Structures are given as structure tokens and as C-alpha cells.
């Protein structure tokens, strides 16, 4: 039961964090990001926010620095938007699954080209 609640809260947090980052965080270092998942602990005390960033490695690093700096602001905005007794501690992590999927897709396309 707790696990289902964590999933529901995680989905709502995903939407809210995207809105906060896109509309409220004014740091120019924050690039074009996509939040792919929010993984909450069962007690809702910690949240890993998985995201991808469009851009070079420097832009990715700058975006993560800006998000770490804005973490307190994002957490306070979440607290005002969501009805939670305790707002989870946020940890931003780069989601490598998109890159991995693109790499596999390219390998499959290369195999199809070789077969022709």
C-alpha cells in the first residue's frame, strides 16, 4: 500500500517539479530538461529525480549545478503546492537510460543497413 502511494506522489512531484523548473526557476544555467522519473522512498522522506538535459556535457554540468543551488526553492514550492506532511529531500540524478536506448537503436539500425 505504501508503495502505491509513493508512486502516486512521485508522479505528481514529477509534474510539479517540471512546472517549477520551467516557470519559476530563473537561473540561466538551467537548460532544456526532461524529468523522466521520480523515485520516492516508502516513507516519502527522499526523492531521486531522474532527468535528461539537452546539450553538451558542459551544459549538463551547469544545469545540475543550477538545480542543486535551486533545490531549497524547488522544495519550498513543492511544499506549497502539494499536501505532504514532510516534503522529501531532493536528489537530482542524470538519467542515462535515454542515451542507452539511443545507442541500442543506432546499433540495430546499423545491423539493418549491413543486412541490405
From Swiss-Prot:
Name of the featured protein: Ribosome-binding factor A
One annotated GO biological process: maturation of SSU-rRNA
Entry similarity comment: Belongs to the RbfA family.
GO molecular function, one term: ribosomal small subunit binding
Pfam families membership: RBFA
Protein's UniProt keywords contain Cytoplasm: yes
Known partners and oligomeric status: Monomer. Binds 30S ribosomal subunits, but not 50S ribosomal subunits or 70S ribosomes.
Main location: cytoplasm
Function as written in the Swiss-Prot or TrEMBL entry: One of several proteins that assist in the late maturation steps of the functional core of the 30S ribosomal subunit. Associates with free 30S ribosomal subunits (but not with 30S subunits that are part of 70S ribosomes or polysomes). Required for efficient processing of 16S rRNA. May interact with the 5'-terminal helix region of 16S rRNA.
A GO CC term assigned to this protein in UniProt: cytosol
Species: Staphylococcus haemolyticus (strain JCSC1435)
Superkingdom in the source lineage: Bacteria
InterPro entries noted in UniProt: KH_dom-like_a/b (IPR015946), RbfA (IPR000238), RbfA_dom_sf (IPR023799), Ribosome-bd_factorA_CS (IPR020053)
Cell compartments where the protein resides: Cytoplasm
Gene that encodes it: rbfA
Keyword tags: Cytoplasm, Ribosome biogenesis
Amino acid at each position: 500500500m505504501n508503495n502505491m502511494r509513493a508512486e502516486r506522489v512521485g508522479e505528481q512531484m514529477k509534474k510539479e517539479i517540471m512546472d517549477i523548473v520551467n516557470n519559476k526557476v530563473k537561473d540561466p544555467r538551467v537548460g532544456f530538461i526532461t524529468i523522466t522519473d521520480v523515485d520516492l522512498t516508502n516513507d516519502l522522506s527522499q526523492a531521486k529525480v531522474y532527468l535528461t538535459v539537452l546539450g553538451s556535457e558542459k551544459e549538463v554540468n551547469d544545469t545540475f549545478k543550477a538545480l542543486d543551488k535551486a533545490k531549497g526553492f524547488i522544495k519550498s514550492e513543492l511544499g506549497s503546492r502539494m499536501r505532504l506532511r514532510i516534503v522529501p529531500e531532493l536528489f537530482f540524478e542524470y538519467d542515462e537510460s535515454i542515451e542507452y536506448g539511443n545507442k541500442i537503436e543506432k546499433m540495430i539500425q546499423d545491423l539493418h543497413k549491413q543486412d541490405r
